[in-house]
């Protein structure tokens, strides 16, 4: 139980990766605050973990609502030890098809929320001289949109930039910042946007011959959240099955 007495906040908790991350952190003894916009789903998720998981429904694209929620959390929890910025909106639209409305929506959820949450939890982490910031990016951040559309790829590239900036600034305070960049995770958000033909084509391009499982991403997050990862900061953990060699 290496995370006993630690409190973690996980966004997008009811998605494939988010659910697996919540399970992994609770299994290591952490108390988890689960964020999701679906109140029924996040409540049901939390009920499965008893008192180890606190459900909170919030639209991460609404900055004012998010800041209000974080103010309430600050009054209930002394410190958030681990922040997992996992929530994301996916779009397959390439450059010409990307509207400004879609661009702003993706940036609000995928990037702005990560910034606001990081700003909210870091002061207590610094005072406590311990903290873990973990950002779920994507192979799209460096693949030029191979696996996703323009707005999504840009937002995930910016997540890596946020990770690097946070890592450099916060290292002297015992706070680490790292990212995980998976490709083609078996989850509704990813798989529902791929036709059977697309799935077969992508499988053929992945050297390991399969898609990534949510539990594999959660395993990486669990390690980055643990005390044993203390010498790692500013690192992007690539999980693409060798796709970069294609």
Language model features by range: what are they?
Residues 2-4, 143, 222, 233-246:
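Short C-terminal tail/terminal secondary-structure segment
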Residues 14-15:
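Conserved glycine-rich cofactor-binding loop
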Residues 94-95, 102-104, 190, 202:
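Substrate-binding pocket helix/loop in short-chain dehydrogenase/reductase
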Residues 118, 155, 163:
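Active-site helix of classical SDR
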Residues 123, 168-169, 230:
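Alpha-helical segment proximal to the catalytic Tyr-Lys
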Residues 171-176, 232-234:
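Short, small/polar-rich loop/turn modules that mediate ligand/substrate recognition or access, typified
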Residues 206-217, 228:
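A conserved structural motif in NAD(P)-dependent oxidoreductases
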């Amino acid at each position: 139980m290496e995370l006993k007495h630690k409190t973690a906040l996980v966004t997008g908790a009811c998605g494939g990766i988010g659910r697996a991350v919540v399970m992994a952190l609770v299994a290591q003894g952490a108390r988890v605050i689960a964020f999701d916009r679906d109140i029924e789903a996040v409540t049901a998720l939390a009920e499965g973990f008893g008192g180890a998981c606190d459900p909170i429904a919030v639209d991460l694209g609404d900055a004012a609502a998010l800041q209000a929620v974080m103010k309430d959390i600050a009054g209930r929890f002394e410190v958030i030890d681990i922040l997992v910025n996992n929530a994301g909106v996916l779009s397959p639209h390439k450059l010409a098809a990307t509207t400004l409305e879609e661009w702003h929506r993706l940036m609000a959820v995928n990037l702005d929320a990560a910034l606001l949450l990081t700003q909210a939890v870091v002061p207590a982490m610094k005072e406590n001289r311990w903290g873990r910031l973990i950002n779920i990016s994507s192979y799209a951040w460096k693949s030029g949109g191979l696996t996703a559309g323009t707005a999504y790829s840009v937002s995930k590239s910016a997540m890596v930039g946020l990770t690097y900036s946070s890592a450099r600034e916060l290292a002297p305070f015992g706070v680490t910042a790292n990212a995980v960049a998976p490709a083609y995770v078996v989850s509704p958000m990813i798989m529902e946007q791929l036709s059977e033909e697309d799935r077969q084509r992508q499988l053929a391009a992945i050297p390991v011959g399969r898609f990534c499982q949510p539990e594999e991403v959660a395993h990486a997050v669990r390690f980055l959240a643990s005390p044993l990862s203390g010498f790692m900061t500013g690192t992007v953990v690539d999980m693409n099955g060798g796709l970069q060699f294609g």
